[in-house]
Design a protein with these regions (language model features):
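Conserved catalytic SET/PR domain of SAM-dependent protein methyltransferases, capturing the structural core
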Residues: 1-280
Length: 280
């Protein structure tokens, strides 16, 4: 029993020490390969924000069309121009869309990861990490990822620097700090999960969901919402992706916000999202 307890404590320490400030200060120079210096935010871009937004819209529209038979409440609230746009997308003479429409007629839909593969040419999923004691990781399950592609989003509740996050942060390895000090809590368990669900329900407008909460479950509607499980590089394995910060614009289509895996802790804030990008 003591040996098992000590082994468990040692494993927890190996995971936690990278967030323990004194240990980081003493060991910073021992791992030069894992350091990444960013001179300023404007230079920390793999691709432009326009390209990021274009990718998100492309994927989210494909997911929306795939769920078209479940969107009746939303469609009735949209302007005619927007409704006609989606009806036109369904009727486009393209083999992929034809097959999609046929599946709708059969009261069936593609899985989200299949939509991602058909839209971007690859799919990703969570699985046990190949790194020792790293828990879960993210793997490309189909296709290949080109350089500069958006491969995932970092989900979670978005906290401004002045907002309370102490209790959520205890023993939480999924808190991501942005360059400007904004924090994203990507933990899908415990109090973090409760806070996210509460904020998501608070911001809902009738049939319109302002965020996606399915990343908290095993049945994810947005297949990109796995970024919190992307592991850092190690001395043995270099990073093949990097994080790029992106603010979702206020004019983002309201019918597609149901796929955004982020929600602001305060209802008056509309800051969303970190994206994981293909780096090399």
């Amino acid at each position: 029993m003591p040996a098992r307890l000590l082994r468990g404590l040692w494993q927890r320490w190996r995971r936690y020490k990278y967030r323990f400030v004194p240990w980081i200060a003493l060991n910073l120079n021992h791992n030069p390969r894992t350091l990444r210096y960013v001179p300023e935010e404007s230079k920390d871009k793999v691709i432009s924000d326009e390209d990021v937004l274009g990718t998100l819209l492309k994927v989210f529209q494909a997911l929306f069309i795939n769920d078209f038979n479940k969107q009746s409440d939303i469609l009735t609230m949209l302007p005619e121009t927007v409704k006609s746009k989606y009806h036109n997308l369904l009727s486009v003479q393209h083999p992929r869309v034809k097959l999609l429409e046929y599946r709708h007629q059969q009261q069936s839909t593609f899985k989200p990861e299949e939509i991602l593969y058909k839209t971007l040419g690859f799919s990703v999923a969570r699985a046990t990490s190949s790194l020792i004691s790293a828990g879960k990781g993210v793997f490309v399950t189909r296709g290949s990822v080109p350089k500069g592609a958006v491969v995932s989003m970092y989900p979670g509740t978005v906290y401004q620097k002045y907002e309370p996050i102490f209790f959520q942060s205890i023993g939480n390895p999924f808190i991501f700090r942005c360059l400007d000090g904004v924090l994203i809590d990507g933990n899908d368990k415990g109090i973090s999960k409760v806070v996210y669900r509460s904020c998501s329900g608070r911001d809902r407008l009738g049939p319109f969901k302002m965020s996606d909460s399915t990343w908290l479950t095993s049945e994810i509607c947005n297949p990109l919402a796995v970024g919190q499980y992307v592991n850092n590089c190690s001395n043995d394995r270099a990073a093949n992706v990097c994080y790029q910060e992106f603010d979702v614009p206020a004019v983002f289509p309201i019918e597609l916000k149901q796929y955004l895996p982020n929600i602001a802790y305060s209802c008056d804030k509309q800051r969303f999202g970190n994206l994981t990008m293909k780096k090399r």
